[in-house]
Amino acid sequence: SGGIRPSIIRASGVAEGGKTSCALAFARNFQATVDNSMAIYIKSEGRLSADMIARSGVDTSPDKWFVYKSNIFESVLQLMRDLITDNPTNCKYFFIIDSMDAMVPKKDMDRSFEDADKVAGGSVLSSNFLKKMALGLATRWHICFMISQVRSKVSVNMYEKTDPKLTNASGGNA
């Protein structure tokens, strides 16, 4: 099944490090080798372009490829659950989430930036995702390729009158 077994795979790396290209290569192989298969690209942050899709060789026919644009954690989770549980044709799915770090809980969408969950937010969402999806994906023979960014530079405005330990700057390896 595309060189990898049904499971959840996480690829982490720097921006422009080839994670999306790698995921698309696996998706192409999955489409070519698994009968009744479909690749679902969940675009929450990634820079997926028509050129990138063309270079990857992914089959973009409607019964083999779908792009879902959302960065709301709950809507992505619901889409995936619906596809794998209400699946009368027994289609095998290769999900690409690009990227997990761009996911936002619905409750944070209505909050101010200062009130939103910050510390290790991406790690908490990934953990919740794994708890809810790992067993269902693996036992029904689906694959999820989660892409994560490594943002190792955390910068703080030295002129701001706040405690530098309480930053809301992006970055870090939480």
Language-model features: where?
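The Walker A/P-loop phosphate-binding site
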Residues: 1-62, 80-85
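Structural motif
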Residues: 9, 38-40, 93-95, 143-145
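A short alpha->loop->secondary-structure connector
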Residues: 33-34, 56-65, 111-119, 161-171
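A short beta-strand-to-loop transition that corresponds to the Sensor-1 phosphate-sensing loop
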Residues: 43-45, 99-100, 146-152
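Catalytic P-loop NTPase motifs of RecA-like helicase/translocase cores
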Residues: 48, 103-104, 153-154
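Short acidic, glycine/serine/threonine-rich loops at helix termini
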Residues: 53-54, 107-110, 156-159
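Phosphate-binding/switch loop-helix module in NTP-utilizing enzymes
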Residues: 70-142
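Phosphate-binding/switch region of NTP-binding enzymes
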Residues: 119-174
